[in-house]
Amino acid sequence: MIGSKKKIGILGGSFDPPHQGHLKISKIAINKLSLDELYWCVTKKNPFKGKTFFSLSSRIKKSKLLTAKVKKIKIKFYEDKIKSKYTVELIKYLNKKNKKTQFYLIIG
């Protein structure tokens, strides 16, 4: 990757629970966009839904189990670090910390 930026996709969500649909869209994005990695950015709670069904730690654990065979998918949690649940703040944070990375927001 000399002279080129690392390509990382961002798929945000509550993953409550993580499921095959999340995995499928992730694999498609990795292949179609030639991503080096894809981050599943788990949020504490979906602001548009009521209560969560599973705890944050359970959702992170289930996400890791579901994606274990796809080495390019990484499970991340940033809300406490960036003090925000908003995607725009996450993208600002990641861009500031990773100057040599091109981020792709995956929406599905």
Language-model segments: which ranges?
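Nucleotidyltransferase catalytic core that binds NTPs
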Residues: 1-108
